[in-house]
Regions:
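Single conserved hydrophobic/aromatic residue that forms the stacking wall/gate
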Residues: 1-9
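Conserved phosphate-binding loops in nucleotide/dinucleotide-binding enzymes
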Residues: 11-43, 47-56, 65-94, 221-231, ...
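Small-residue-rich helix-loop
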Residues: 97-199
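Charged substrate- and nucleic-acid-binding regions of tRNA-handling and nucleotidyl-transfer enzymes
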Residues: 185-247
């Protein structure tokens, strides 16, 4: 005879059952927010089932292979949106670069219209930092146009930077990058870290101002080196010059 088990799923506050009647999200609603269908299935499986080993991230095929009814819990399952996002991020990390590029490109193109952008390069920077595809358009919205930003963004306690030190850093960086003939992540990294060694300063003292100048954002999908490469030499240098103007 076939046995059936039904799980009760509660919201994170543990006070009420999830219900479409109460406006709780369906599978389709969650996927529409940028979650991968296989990540949602993985998360739902973990709500009331404990795998035998330490691994919690499974493809659909791996779930079929590993699922055992003996691992199902009798206790009500808790719907934790933080855990859902973590599971989704883990599935994104598992993607091959080619598959991730295919998935992420439409989200990039919502805000990045420039045709000179190296999409595989941008995708390689985004993949380890993306938790949710719907976050991507805002993550890359500085690429087409440098947003207006306040110079207080150059102040970073941990990096020990302020407006004065950032101006010094950008003035030191500009001629070094201007001289670069080969413009790529490796050459930019070598040039900037060579300058860091020459000036005998901490990495962040130099790199935080560069990242701020080229992005105009507090949080970016990558550091100053990667962003300079993505933007291209002409645009990156123009943004650094703009940073110098703002700080002067």
């Amino acid at each position: 005879s076939r046995r059936q088990r039904q799980m009760c799923i509660r919201d994170r506050d543990q006070t009420s059952k999830l219900s479409k009647r109460n406006g709780d999200a369906s599978f389709e609603d969650i996927v529409a927010k940028g979650y991968l269908p296989e990540a949602v299935v993985n998360f739902i499986a973990l709500l009331g089932w404990a795998p035998k080993g330490e691994e919690e991230i499974f493809s659909l095929e791996e779930l079929v292979e590993n699922f055992d009814i003996s691992g199902i819990s009798k206790s009500p399952a808790i719907f934790d949106p933080v855990k859902l996002k973590a599971v989704n991020a883990a599935h994104i990390r598992r993607m091959t670069p080619e598959v991730f590029l295919e998935h992420v490109t439409p989200y990039i193109r919502q805000t990045v219209k420039r045709q000179d952008i190296d999409l595989p390069l941008l995708a390689s920077v985004l993949q380890p930092r993306t938790e949710l595809f719907n976050d991507v358009p805002e993550m890359v919205d500085f690429i087409d146009k440098l947003p207006e930003y306040d110079i207080t963004m150059y102040c970073h306690k941990k990096m020990k930077t302020n407006e004065e030190t950032s101006l010094k850093a950008l003035k030191a960086v500009l001629p070094v990058l201007e001289k670069l003939e080969d413009w790529n992540t490796e050459s930019i990294h070598k040039a900037l870290f060579g300058l860091i060694a020459e000036l005998e300063v901490k990495n962040g003292w130099l790199l935080w101002p560069v990242r701020t100048a080229v992005s105009g954002k507090q949080f970016t999908p990558g550091g100053g080196v990667e962003l300079c490469d993505i933007l291209g030499k002409e645009d990156a240098l123009a943004r650094i010059r703009r940073g110098i103007e703002k700080l002067s």
